[in-house]
């Protein structure tokens, strides 16, 4: 489902220009996407929507169980639009979001596996973190994959760092216990790491097939960022 809009490089909207050409390009993208779905035996319907991609997908997320987007385009305007969408959509969507990387930080094409063997999830005591943990466990169990639960401890310079780490470990054990009972065959690895969560999860993305985090979004649990 391609959504297109005219955006200048200073992030202001400009005239759309040749609507027919834009529509034709979008239709070509849809035809290729549907062909891929057909090859996999997946029933697919197509739709072209005119508008800002992020806004369009936020509205569509009201009526879908899952939305999948890329986080890098092929450069230029396409990259700007997809980058903006992948950054803003998870925070405002009404359903879980899967964000699929196109390239790594060095611009190399990503190799995406069709088999999921390792799943990571960022976990804290918030209701969003607990929901992310639940969904990650269900997802990992469905794929018969390992689940790495990561709890980040902010950098501290006090004298009781060991006590704080022990407290985080105890809290993580409490959060994981219901998952172990619900999925007795699921291999769950627990990681307590110092520093910001974003660093730990970014590192995890290099050797995991899926990373799950919660999103506070609209003041409640409104979406997940998967990717």
Which functions belong to the PLM regions below?
Residues 26, 82-86, 112, 129, ...:
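Short, conserved glycine- and acidic-residue-centered signature motifs
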